[in-house]
Amino acid sequence: MNGAVASGWGLIAGLLLTITTAGASTETPPKVLRVYGPGGPHHVLTECADLFEEKHGIDVIVMKALPHDLDRKLPEDGDIYYGGAEYMLEDFDRRNPGVLDMTSAENLHPRRIGIVVRKGNPLNINGIEDLRREGVDILDVKLENMREFHGSTPGRIGNVRHLVYTGQEGIKAWRLNPGIDAWVTYKSWHVSLEDEAEFIEIPGERAVRFTPMAITQRTPHRQEAEKFLAFLRSKEARHIFLKHGWD
């Protein structure tokens, strides 16, 4: 009799476990937006994503990657692409046709381009024309594509003496090498150097670049992606971008 009772309880326990497991397996996994792009806007978008999650309960993971990694990762599990300038999105789309829904592409918050110089501006650099002077050592970041602002003849490197690949490497080079006199870059990078450098703005529309965004074709979370882009257009997001050196 005791054996039969034990067997019955075992059967009931097994049924409960099966029901619980089945219920758990049908639960909808939490929606997570994966946003990929370069390092420059990464920290700003991460701060926006944190506030967006707090307000709307949608988790957004912002991941920075170099171009060759973006080409691999975004088609795999990316929901949104962001760039540091318009040409970056255009280049990605050219290399990876069909990955982005180009009808969703839009250019958000602008960044001013200017010249980072040493504190006190010892060489009295006030514009592009001064970068042509003999003895001015220029830092160039390849991914920023700033050659047109170096004052040199097209096809020549002019006074560029220091070459790095990313903006983060640019910050490091500026701090480690006091022989660098000027770095043509975005105002947002100068925010990290305010205590040790000056920023000379380059005037005009050609010295302003926007932050492009686009939703991927593969995303299963289209509605959430559109909601995040709408949030990035909000006054709250604008305040975050302004704080980090965007215009």
Please identify what each model-predicted range represents:
Residues 9-20:
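Bacterial N-terminal signal peptides
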Residues 22-59, 68-78, 85-86, 91-94, ...:
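Exported/periplasmic ABC-transporter solute-binding proteins
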Residues 1-11:
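Bacterial N-terminal signal peptides that target proteins for export
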Residues 64-66:
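Short loop/edge segments at beta-strand edges and connector loops
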Residues 4, 20-21:
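Residue-level detector of intrinsically disordered/flexible regions characterized by low predicted structural confidence
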